[in-house]
Amino acid sequence: MRIILLGAPGSGKGTQAQFIMKKYGIPHISTGDMLRTTVNKESVLGKNIQAIIKLGNLVPDQLVIELVKERIIQYDCSKGFLLDGFPRTLTQAYAMEVAGINVDIVLILRIPDKIIINRIVGRMVHEPSGRIYHVTFNPPKQKGKDDITGENLIIRQDDKEDTVRHRLIGYHQQMIPIITYYNNANIRNIRCFTIDANCPISTLNEKIVRILG
């Protein structure tokens, strides 16, 4: 089972990716996680990526493609994988096809921008563990502190409102041709589904299971 999961930041993509990974036993490949890992290594590539992200811009196709190519040739992807947030441009989609990276299903999570902004702004992260909090929806027990370790929480640059709005504009511009591309991909035996994600997590889980079986 080879799946692409697409959706704007804050659409619930990460939560659903974890659900799919556990239920169907395939690895979750997140381009966001790979990029953050590269940034944390403080290499030249990591510093370049960090500068791009701080401006709220998307990382260039070629950089992301190279990271994904290295990941999907690993053994745990031999029986399937879940690509989270990739491809996000036509160049990336074409590069996947040229490289012989075939997928079976594309899931696109759709949710209004206003709701996405409310979800993301106010989000806080415990970087060592990846635990995520929100000042309104999931506040920590102690303000600004991780519940488990008591360590400080941070607000990522890409979770600030101006950055989120800028990213959403870029996301929509990129997604229109991507959606068209995969909706017309029936000749390559790719099934594409757009799912209303403005619903409780359990409801969204059920919608996805009905599609994947």
Swiss-Prot record:
Gene Ontology BP terms: AMP salvage
Localization, UniProt: Cytoplasm
PANTHER family in UniProt: NUCLEOTIDE KINASE
Family: Belongs to the adenylate kinase family.
Domain remarks in the Swiss-Prot or TrEMBL record: Consists of three domains, a large central CORE domain and two small peripheral domains, NMPbind and LID, which undergo movements during catalysis. The LID domain closes over the site of phosphoryl transfer upon ATP binding. Assembling and dissambling the active center during each catalytic cycle provides an effective means to prevent ATP hydrolysis.
Assembly, per entry: Monomer.
Protein name, entry field: Adenylate kinase
Gene: adk
